[in-house]
A protein has these predicted regions:
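S-adenosyl-L-methionine
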Residues: 90-122
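Signature of N6-adenine DNA methyltransferases within the class I
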Residues: 9-10, 14-25, 47-54, 81-87, ...
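Short, well-ordered loop/turn elements at secondary-structure boundaries
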Residues: 37-38, 71-76, 110-111, 126-128, ...
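Polybasic, glycine- and aromatic-enriched phosphate-binding surface used to engage nucleic acids
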Residues: 280-511, 518, 524-528, 550-554, ...
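A secondary-structure boundary/capping signal
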Residues: 116-117, 187-188, 342
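Glycine-rich, phosphate-binding/catalytic loops in enzymes
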Residues: 58-63, 94-96, 148-152, 200-203, ...
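Short, conserved catalytic or adaptor-binding loops enriched in Gly and charged residues
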Residues: 66-70, 102-110, 203-207
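Class I S-adenosyl-L-methionine
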Residues: 1-95, 136, 166-169, 193-201, ...
Length: 562
């Protein structure tokens, strides 16, 4: 990330390729039916090197505008926090204005009103804009100065949890749209499924209309290579219109031409209704969305599939270098050590333990209480040797008498409970069973316990494509195609109720537990799923699940099979 010398802040600059800019500009003009730019007001909230501003100015100049008109003064507002960017862009725009026969003095006057150096989120705008377009900065939460975090939280309802700075850029930019205005950003797609994006998704659903959502997470639409998981968004106020959507694998001109709005042979899927409220945007294909909706209507979630079924995450110590494997550097009472299983210990649904231990500061018999270190002199000496670092943590300052506590409470009963263990980031289906209650999970491992389920049967269900596909729908995509099995995602998974499974079906699932043959496992699960409900069989990605006339969320055409 680049830092602005004058401001001393991370600017989050990622510049957009010209063909992608052209696609966005054409889409905005099509959506807003803007035949001419003259008389319009355009806003670019984070103009950078002018990837959007320069083509906009050139298109405006091609229409032979009156440079001395009020319309010329109000045509453009472009902001950037970098004074260096603003100066470079000022020179480039001035050059184009003068080349188009605009007097230098008038060009300078236009530039004075057009280009603004400063924090867009803190700027005040009296006018509303017909086009808001750009590529907002991608600055992670931890790189936002704490003073500005507080300021943004007070100003923007969408700035929740640990969200990145593009989220309030969305909120403010949308608020500046005119009634007939059109908004378009290219930026990460993280908010469409993440927890921190809930408020922004709800704001968009309640007040605006998504005209286009083009998922480009497997492409590289930027000048430099970055891991941004990008998407193009076009949003307006026309809430009675359809939504166009697609996922593309490259950002080249031929592909972009195939997903242009208004083209008779476009490969865009068309939704009669986009996602409601804060629901995650699970798919760009309306057939997949309806299939997922049908699963949700047919089956309960995991925690509701049987009484006493719980989902949780392993322990975060707040100082792994101190709490994990302390026995390798010091003598520790064995009763203070818990076998700890981490994500790297789980491969192909099996546990291969690396003999790491967690130094447990909590009482084994009452995990709401800390250990009495007077009874454990070796552990006490070890904690004392690390006291400065442990006491400096926020959780220790908040509980000074319990300064040696872990960040999360260690629940000793969980260690001895049979449980399913699921690494967070994986390609899918890597689900293991701690049948005897031998391990405590680390914070990158999620766990499931149940009083009713046969855990081998549940484990097979969770390994199947039936469940992996659901996780993939609600998870953000990671590098290499990995997905996240976070608790929030697991809680959105729907499976047959335990009570709906016959003894024979339970036996089929259990018999498949030892198999590494995914096709066999999927066939078993598919048969069990079909048999567990009297309704029409449900397959998340069955190609012929719906004809286009049957699909209740679609209109016109689906994305052609590719």
């Amino acid at each position: 990330m680049k830092k602005d010398v004058q401001q001393g802040e991370v600017t989050g600059e990622v510049f957009t390729r010209p063909e992608v800019v052209a696609y966005m500009l054409n889409s905005v003009r099509h959506c807003g039916k803007f035949k001419s730019l003259v008389g319009l007001r355009v806003l670019e909230p984070s103009c950078g090197d002018g990837a959007f501003v320069l083509p906009l100015v050139e298109a405006w100049l091609s229409e032979k505008p009156d440079f001395d008109s009020v319309d010329a003064d109000s045509f453009l507002r472009a902001c950037d926090i970098s004074s260096e960017n603003i100066e470079k862009l000022r020179g480039a725009v001035r050059e184009r204005l003068i080349a188009a026969s605009c007097a230098r003095a008038r060009a300078n006057a236009l530039l004075a009103s057009w280009l603004v150096c400063g924090d867009f989120l803190l700027q005040e705008f009296k006018e509303r804009f017909d086009i808001v377009i750009g590529n907002p900065p991608y600055i992670r939460f931890d790189d936002i100065p704490s003073a500005k975090q507080k300021e943004y939280r007070a100003m923007f309802s969408s700035f929740t949890e640990r969200c990145d700075i593009y989220v309030p850029f969305f909120e403010k930019s949308l608020a500046l749209l005119s009634d007939k205005g059109v908004f378009s950003f290219i930026c990460t797609n993280r908010f469409t499924k993440s927890s921190y994006g809930k408020q922004l998704r709800r704001l968009i659903a309640d007040r605006y209309h998504v005209a286009l959502y083009l998922n480009m997470e497997h492409t590289q639409p930027f000048v430099q290579e970055v891991s941004a998981y990008p998407a193009i968004y076009i949003i307006d106020h026309n809430r009675n219109r359809v939504t166009y959507s697609a996922t593309i694998d490259d950002a080249g001109i031929p592909t972009l031409n195939r997903v242009r709005m208004g083209q008779p042979k476009s490969e865009l899927s068309v939704f009669k209704q986009w996602y409601k409220g804060d629901s995650p945007w699970i798919s760009t294909d309306c057939r997949e969305r309806e299939a997922a909706d049908k699963i949700a209507r047919t089956f309960p979630t995991i925690t509701k599939s049987a009484e006493g079924t719980e989902i949780g995450i392993g322990v975060a110590s707040g100082a792994d270098d101190i709490y994990i494997n302390a026995q390798r550097v010091a003598s520790i009472e064995p009763s203070c050590l818990l076998p700890l299983v981490a994500s790297e210990d789980i491969h192909d649904g099996r546990i291969s333990w690396d003999e790491r231990y967690l130094l447990n500061p909590y009482d084994d018999n009452d995990d709401t209480q800390m250990r009495d270190l007077a009874r454990y002199p070796l552990a006490a000496a070890y904690f004392d040797s690390h006291a400065p670092k442990l006491k400096a943590r926020y959780c220790a300052r908040k509980h000074p008498h319990d300064w040696y506590r872990t960040l999360d409470r260690v629940k000793y009963a969980l260690l001895r409970s049979p449980k399913i263990l699921i690494p967070d980031i994986q390609l899918g289906g890597n689900v293991a069973l701690d049948e005897c209650g031998s391990y405590y999970p680390h914070h990158n491992v999620y766990w499931i316990t149940s009083r009713k389920w046969n855990l081998k049967a549940l484990c097979v269900l969770l390994r199947s494509s039936f469940v992996t596909s659901q996780i993939r729908n609600v998870s953000v995509q990671m590098r290499g195609g990995s997905i996240r099995y976070q608790a929030q995602n697991l809680r959105n998974v729907h499976i047959p109720a335990w009570s709906s499974l016959s003894e024979g079906n339970v036996e089929k699932l259990v018999s498949a537990y030892e198999s590494n043959d995914t096709e066999y496992l999927d066939a078993v699960v598919d048969a069990v799923v079909r048999d567990s409900t009297a309704r029409q069989p449900v397959r998340l990605f069955q190609a012929d699940l719906f004809n286009k006339e049957e699909c209740p969320v679609c209109q016109i055409e689906h994305v052609p099979d590719r």
